[in-house]
């Protein structure tokens, strides 16, 4: 997909990993995805914030170009909450105003964990929770416009809410971001932002045609994420947002994660929302400090599609 220069409100636009040892996180993710990092913090500042850049050829449903291109894709930083050393991946959603988003979150019954603040000259951000406790963040852009590369190998491809209260989540996120849900196959549901497909067609005029050829459900061009019910046999799993990165080979990525000291939480499998024209192969991994994430590979059954 071509490099991004901003998003529209309600779209996932950035992810970062909060790590007790960010330098170790840089080593792991650099080895896994081939990311190159630059520290955005001054040497005298407390904590570190390493912005990751990725170069990759297009190989997704959105783009068949094999020209190499690159851009900022994510970051690895110090865990900001001293009392919470747990490593985790954080999802950010684009907003016009972090302060107005905070008001919508409160009105919808969510929580404001960290009030809106300016993160250097990068963005204005805040940390919220939905009524079930799933944490998420917002991104009011300043000098940094979020992820410049998405959907390509090594870049963000999907964000998912895992929750026990699907109905409550529908109501909350509709109020905060204007989302609705649609069926996306395999019994799954996607978060759809009306009009997002029109925005994407600025980058890819044939987007809807390509999605139809791939067997994507009607309205999939508006999907910005998914909603997954937490199973009853997982009582200790809290509500949370998860991140998925595109890769060239999910099986090889899982093996490489182990070599780098990570863990395979869910071995590679073919996702139930695969279709007759493509397979989504997915694995869930953990980094050495405990942050979890998924890696997926879009595998076209038709060699003319996304290959």
Predicted regions located by residue number:
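Vicinal oxygen chelate
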Residues: 1-7, 11-20, 50-53, 78-104, 110-152, 183-219, 229-234, ...
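Core segments of cupin and vicinal oxygen chelate
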Residues: 2, 7-9, 16-68, 107, ...
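Active-site-adjacent scaffolding segments
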Residues: 4, 40-154
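A compositionally biased, intrinsically disordered/low-complexity signal enriched
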Residues: 28-29, 33, 93, 105, ...
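Short loop/beta submotifs within extracellular cysteine-rich repeat domains
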Residues: 35-37, 59, 100-101, 181-182, ...
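Residue-level detector of beta-propeller blades
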Residues: 37, 72-73, 112-113, 181, ...
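Glycine-centered structural positions embedded in regular secondary structure
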Residues: 74-77, 224-229
């Amino acid at each position: 997909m071509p490099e991004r220069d901003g998003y529209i409100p309600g779209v996932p636009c950035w992810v970062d990993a909060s790590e007790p040892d960010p330098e170790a996180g840089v080593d792991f993710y650099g080895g896994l995805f081939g990311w190159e990092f630059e520290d955005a913090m001054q040497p005298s500042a407390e904590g570190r914030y390493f912005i990751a850049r990725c170069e990759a050829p297009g190989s997704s449903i959105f783009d068949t170009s094999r020209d190499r291109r690159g851009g900022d894709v994510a970051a690895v930083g110090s865990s900001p909450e001293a009392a919470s050393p747990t490593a985790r991946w954080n999802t950010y959603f684009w907003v016009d105003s972090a302060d107005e988003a905070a008001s919508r979150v409160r009105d919808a019954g969510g929580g404001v964990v960290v009030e809106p603040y300016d993160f250097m000259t990068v963005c204005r951000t805040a940390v919220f929770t939905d009524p079930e406790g799933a944490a998420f963040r917002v991104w009011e852009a300043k000098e940094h416009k979020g992820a410049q590369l998405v959907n390509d190998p090594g870049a963000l491809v999907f964000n998912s809410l895992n929750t026990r209260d699907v109905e409550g989540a529908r109501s909350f996120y509709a109020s905060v971001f204007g989302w609705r849900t649609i069926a996306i196959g395999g019994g799954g549901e996607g978060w759809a932002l009306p009009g997002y497909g029109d925005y994407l067609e600025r980058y890819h005029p044939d987007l809807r045609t390509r999605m139809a050829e791939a067997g994507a459900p009607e309205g999939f061009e508006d999907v910005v994420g998914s909603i997954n019910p937490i199973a009853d046999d997982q009582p200790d799993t809290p509500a949370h947002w998860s991140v998925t990165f595109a890769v060239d080979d999910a099986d090889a990525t899982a093996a490489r994660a182990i070599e780098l000291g990570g863990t395979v939480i869910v071995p590679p499998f073919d996702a139930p929302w695969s279709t007759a024209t493509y397979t989504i192969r997915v694995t869930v991994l953990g980094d050495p400090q405990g942050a979890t994430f998924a890696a997926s590979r879009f595998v076209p059954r038709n060699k003319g599609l996304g290959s």
